[in-house]
Each structure stands twice: as structure tokens, then as C-alpha cells.
């Protein structure tokens, strides 16, 4: 036998294997790699495969105690990125045995935990993951999913309407509950805690939950519709988070909320499991996502974070609006909307989808459009997102000149008008403004909203665009 040979050798000698044929059980990753000057793309891709699986910087004698061919990641293909200098898409295959079953935390720790600080790379971005069906089946996924949520709420054939209570910080619990009641009474399906509403000196969580529950039940009694408020259970530790979720269940409310990136995947999966066992819907906010996903050449694309959330568990997740104040190019946004909702998604590079993904009946997640949207956006939102979505107007409800309830009425009327027009075969993209103006004739609340927001636009170039 050759025996152990100490020393450093190029990664590509072991981890670049263009002849490798991927297996149905492999986790496949597409990385956007920007090598340092003088580093060949094959070496950069192999380094990513090595450092995110079994490799380290030097040969170690314990390599001989295992079967590296069975466990190593492999860079099996490299494509140059069109229009970009010294950028490549490196495709890496990971054997399934490298990952703990049912753990998004372990999956990310392995694939992106260490390699992003690697000196041989100027920048690195995880663009997409293919999760094999064998691994998908180890996850519970969303607590309930789209169909079960509609059945619980008894609401069909239209998007759901929400509103984030503003100002997000500073209201007392009683005033907060009053704002919730006004919005729900006016016709919204949900109201929402903002992502940073946890348990602060001006409003402790228990007081907020009590006043919001009162608002929910009072508005339900008046409207005959099932209502909800996303009670944010995010906390400084898992025990406190679960205490808040348990209290929400004891109050009999239908939904709680979690900030899944700041709270962490372990906490999120724990909460999602509790929600399924106890009949609570789970709304997910993606606070901190732009720190990770906004730069085009470094970080993790949101389509990966969206897939991870579907595995970890959540019934709603914020997905961008295309038309509002926050980043979101149309094709890119629609690519992760289908990855959240559909059961089988074909590879489609025109939308940035690198791999075919089969979710094998894992429940779907409702995308939430939220951020700088108002009644004039309603036709575009209905056309872009379709029925299985939540359209969330914070300032677009609470900023109504007549108050919260009329703001909610304006949103509900504009939504119903757009859905009816679509069902009659009208073109929302072309006739949207006319549809809204027609509805204004029989809704003074909508007419007032249209007057306030007729000139508001957010016209900036998206940072994250398709190649």
C-alpha cells in the first residue's frame, strides 16, 4: 500500500470530478464562485466542495480510517456566468449521509457554515439547492399548509388580507388592541405584530396577547368571519418562545408568528412542531434576510432560504411584493413563490431555478406580499400572486385619512373588485386602474384612499437581477 503521505495538495485532485453522475439521493448545490486572481475555477469549485464536506487544508492520516469516496462532496460541473468577469456557477453534489435527518440547522452548518470565509475566494453565493425526496421526507414542513388553512378560516377563491400594526413600536397594549380591532372589523382577515414587537417595556407580551385576543373575538362576532392576529412568539430563548405560543393557544387564537432567521432554524422547527400538534397556524417573518441575500455575488439567495423555511415549517412567509417599497424583481420573486406553493417545480434558468424540485406532497406555504403597497397596487398584486397569497397593507391601511376601519374597508373593496373582474375575464394588468376607479363609485372609503396614494411610487433599480 502507498501509506499516509503528509503535505498539502490541490483540492481539485480529490474534489473536482466532472465525470461524476449525480444520484437521486444527493443534495445538489449551485454556488456563484468568485475566485481570487490566479485561482482556477476548478480549484475554487473543488475547494468549496471540500471545505463544506470532508476536506481540510492539508492531508490528514485519519482520512485512511474512512471511505472518502462515499462521504466527500464533489464539484461536478462549472459554468461561467454570462456578462460577469471571473464569476462561475460551481455545481456541488453532497452524499445524503453527510446530513442529520430533519435538521435544517445541520444542513446549513455543513453547506455554508465554514466555506464563505475561505481566502481563495473573493466572494461566494449559494444560489440554489436541490433537496432530494428522501431528505424532504424527514421533515414535517409547514404546520398545516395552504388547504388546511383555508379550511380553518373558511375563506376560498381570493387572496387573504393582512395589515401590520403601525407605529411598530411605542403603542400601549390597549391602544394596540384597539388598532387590531378596527382593522379586523373593517374587513381584513389578519393583523400582524411587526417583526421587532416582542416584549418591550412599553408593551409586555402577555398584555398584548390579551388585548389582541379581545379584538379578534369582538370583530369575529360583529362580522361573522374568522379573524386572526399574528402574535409574535419570538423571544430571547426557546423556553420563553414556547411559553408565548402556549398562552396564545390557551386564549383560543388561530395563529402565531416567528422571526425565523433571527430566531434560528432550531427554534423555528420546534415552534412549527408545536403548532401542528396544537392546531395553530404559523406566520413567518424573514427579518434579517437582506443581510444574507441582497448582494448578488455573496451570501445566500432567498430561494434557498425559502426552501429551508418550507422544510423547517411555516404557513406564511414574506416574499416581497414586486411593486412595493422593498427589493423584489418580478421573475425572481415568482421563482420562490412557486417554490413555496407548488408540489413539483421544473428547472427554469430564466427564473433563476437551477434544479427541478419535487416536494413529494410536503404542505405549501402562502407567500406574503408586504411593504409599501396600497390600493392602486391591488390589481397587479392579484395578477402576480393569485389567490394563494396574503396581501398585507400596513401604512396602506392605517394611513387612510379616515382611520383604520375605513382603510381596511378600502382594501377589502378593492380586492373584491379585482377578484370579480378577473373572474369575469378582464385583464387586470391592462384594466387595473379602471377597475379600481369603478369600485370607487360605490365605496367612499376606497375613493378617499385612491386620492391619498395616487402619486406614490417606489422606482428604484433592483439589486438582485437575473443573469
UniProtKB/Swiss-Prot annotation:
Database matches in SUPFAM superfamilies: RuBisCo, C-terminal domain, RuBisCO, large subunit, small (N-terminal) domain
Top-level taxon of origin: Eukaryota
Site (described: Transition state stabilizer): 325
UniProt keyword Flavoprotein present: no
A single GO BP: photorespiration
Post-translational events: The disulfide bond which can form in the large chain dimeric partners within the hexadecamer appears to be associated with oxidative stress and protein turnover.
Binding site for substrate: 114, 164, 168, 286, 318, 370
Keyword Magnesium belongs to the record: yes
Cofactor note: Binds 1 Mg(2+) ion per subunit.
Modified residues (N6,N6,N6-trimethyllysine): 5
Active site: 166, 285
Modified residues (N6-carboxylysine): 192
Pfam families to which the protein is assigned, alphabetical: RuBisCO_large, RuBisCO_large_N
The enzyme's E.C. designation: 4.1.1.39
Residues that hold Mg(2+) according to the record: 192, 194-195
Catalytically driven reaction(s): 2 (2R)-3-phosphoglycerate + 2 H(+) = D-ribulose 1,5-bisphosphate + CO2 + H2O; D-ribulose 1,5-bisphosphate + O2 = 2-phosphoglycolate + (2R)-3-phosphoglycerate + 2 H(+)
InterPro entries given in the database record: RuBisCO, RuBisCo_large_chain_AS, RuBisCO_lsu_C, RuBisCO_lsu_C_sf, RuBisCO_lsu_fd_N, RuBisCO_lsu_N_sf, RuBisCO_lsuI
Compartments it resides in: Plastid, Chloroplast
Family the entry assigns: Belongs to the RuBisCO large chain family. Type I subfamily.
Summary of subunit composition and partner proteins: Heterohexadecamer of 8 large chains and 8 small chains; disulfide-linked. The disulfide link is formed within the large subunit homodimers.
Functional description taken from the UniProt entry: RuBisCO catalyzes two reactions: the carboxylation of D-ribulose 1,5-bisphosphate, the primary event in carbon dioxide fixation, as well as the oxidative fragmentation of the pentose substrate in the photorespiration process. Both reactions occur simultaneously and in competition at the same active site.
Full protein name: Ribulose bisphosphate carboxylase large chain
Source organism of the structure: Hydrophyllum virginianum
Gene: rbcL
Amino acid at each position: 500500500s502507498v501509506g499516509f503521505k503528509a503535505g498539502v495538495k490541490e483540492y481539485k485532485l480529490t474534489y473536482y470530478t466532472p465525470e461524476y453522475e449525480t444520484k437521486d439521493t444527493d443534495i445538489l448545490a449551485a454556488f456563484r464562485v468568485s475566485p481570487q486572481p490566479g485561482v482556477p475555477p476548478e480549484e475554487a469549485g473543488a475547494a468549496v466542495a471540500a471545505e463544506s464536506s470532508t476536506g481540510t487544508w492539508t492531508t490528514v492520516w485519519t482520512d485512511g480510517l474512512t471511505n472518502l469516496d462515499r462521504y466527500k462532496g464533489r464539484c461536478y460541473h462549472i459554468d461561467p456566468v454570462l456578462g460577469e468577469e471571473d464569476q462561475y456557477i460551481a455545481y456541488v453534489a453532497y452524499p445524503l449521509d453527510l446530513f442529520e435527518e430533519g435538521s435544517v440547522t445541520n444542513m446549513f452548518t455543513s453547506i455554508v457554515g465554514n466555506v464563505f470565509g475561505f481566502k481563495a475566494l473573493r466572494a461566494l453565493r449559494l444560489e440554489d439547492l436541490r433537496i432530494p425526496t428522501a431528505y424532504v421526507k424527514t421533515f414535517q414542513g409547514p404546520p398545516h399548509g395552504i388547504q388546511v388553512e383555508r379550511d380553518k378560516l373558511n375563506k376560498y377563491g381570493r387572496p387573504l388580507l393582512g395589515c401590520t400594526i403601525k407605529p411598530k413600536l411605542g403603542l400601549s397594549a390597549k391602544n394596540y388592541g384597539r388598532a387590531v380591532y378596527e382593522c379586523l372589523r373593517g374587513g381584513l382577515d389578519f393583523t400582524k405584530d411587526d417583526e421587532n414587537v416582542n416584549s418591550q417595556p412599553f408593551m409586555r407580551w402577555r398584555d398584548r396577547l390579551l388585548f389582541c385576543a379581545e379584538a379578534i373575538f369582538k370583530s369575529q362576532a360583529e362580522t361573522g368571519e374568522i379573524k386572526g392576529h399574528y402574535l409574535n412568539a419570538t423571544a430571547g430563548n426557546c423556553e420563553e418562545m414556547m411559553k408565548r405560543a402556549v398562552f396564545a393557544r390557551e386564549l383560543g387564537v388561530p395563529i402565531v408568528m416567528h422571526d425565523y432567521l433571527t430566531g434560528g432554524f432550531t427554534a423555528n422547527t420546534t415552534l412549527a412542531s408545536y403548532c401542528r400538534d396544537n392546531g395553530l397556524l404559523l406566520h413567518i417573518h424573514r427579518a434579517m434576510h437582506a443581510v444574507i441575500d441582497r448582494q448578488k455575488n455573496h451570501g445566500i439567495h432567498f430561494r434557498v432560504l425559502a426552501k429551508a423555511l418550507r422544510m423547517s415549517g411555516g404557513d406564511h412567509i414574506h416574499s416581497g411584493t414586486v411593486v412595493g417599497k422593498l427589493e423584489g424583481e418580478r421573475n425572481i420573486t415568482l421563482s420562490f413563490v412557486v417554490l413555496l406553493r407548488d408540489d413539483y417545480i421544473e428547472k427554469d434558468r430564466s427564473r433563476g431555478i437551477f434544479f427541478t424540485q419535487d416536494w413529494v406532497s410536503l404542505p405549501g406555504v402562502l407567500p406574503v406580499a408586504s411593504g409599501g403597497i396600497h390600493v392602486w397596487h391591488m390589481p397587479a398584486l392579484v395578477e402576480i400572486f393569485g389567490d394563494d397569497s396574503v396581501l398585507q397593507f400596513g401604512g396602506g391601511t392605517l394611513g387612510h385619512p379616515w382611520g383604520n376601519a375605513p382603510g381596511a374597508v378600502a382594501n377589502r373593496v378593492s380586492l373584491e373588485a379585482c377578484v370579480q373582474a378577473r373572474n369575469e375575464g378582464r385583464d387586470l394588468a391592462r384594466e387595473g386602474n379602471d377597475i379600481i376607479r369603478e369600485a370607487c363609485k360605490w365605496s367612499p372609503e376606497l375613493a378617499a384612499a385612491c386620492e391619498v396614494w395616487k402619486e406614490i411610487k417606489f422606482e428604484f433599480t433592483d439589486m438582485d437581477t437575473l443573469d
